[in-house]
């Protein structure tokens, strides 16, 4: 049993893994295609989560009616990851960390459009504030500098925030009766079924065979820790703590990304980037808060 005080550190561990995941992915993009990275990440995560499920003697039976729902979520999740990883090829890990954090903005807007969920005045202000921060970040201080070609990486990552908003909306409306562990395991299996067959070829097999030590460390980190351990920790934390308290830890994720990108990728930490990031975070905070 985890001590009462120690449980508050667990969500932070998950957030540290997720924040550092962009650095590991950035390393891998020098050796593998986005599709290969996603496929390997899923395979290692499935192996770990299956092992945990077996040790815990979980029920692996699945309701056939759930297949369509899980397939839909998996399809969205695969596309989300693909444009995120592809975008990371053309932008910095630091920018990616800040931009990914805007997903709640899209969730709020999609909730308004499709489910008539009301936006308070403060939430609208939060959206405006976050957009200002985004424009400053992507435009490097001048929104008129934003170019579809030059900033394609940032814009692809932003698109992945939008797809995560769609995923969250669909997930919210779908009622699945499985435990968090089995839900994420079934989702990963379905995602692997979608992406692995269209990824594997002779060139991919050769690139995996020639993967460097750094590459293997990176893919194991992504699969076992970021997609495996972190999800288990997060599910445990949500069960043991209030959702709002657990969710608050996510505000630290971009700061972890910026710090680890500086340490391992030699990315610069500029005043403008930190200021833009803080503005984005403030806007997202206003949107997330129940006023």
Which residues does each PLM region occupy?
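Glycine-/small-residue-enriched transmembrane alpha-helix faces in small-molecule transporters
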Residues: 1-36, 147-173, 193-195
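Specific transmembrane alpha-helical segments of multi-pass solute transporters/efflux pumps
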Residues: 17, 21-22, 50-100, 136, ...
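Juxtamembrane helix-loop-helix junctions in multi-pass membrane proteins
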Residues: 17-46, 92-95, 166-190, 205-208
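Hydrophobic/aromatic residues within transmembrane alpha-helices
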Residues: 28, 37, 41, 87, ...
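Helix-helix packing/entry segments at the starts of transmembrane helices
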Residues: 38-40, 82, 96-102, 170-192, ...
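C-terminal transmembrane-helix exit sites in multi-pass transporters
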Residues: 48-57, 103-128, 254-275
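Hydrophobic transmembrane alpha-helices of multi-pass small-molecule transport proteins
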Residues: 49, 71, 122-140, 195, ...
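Transmembrane alpha-helical segments that form core, pore/gating elements
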Residues: 49, 107-109, 113, 145-204, ...
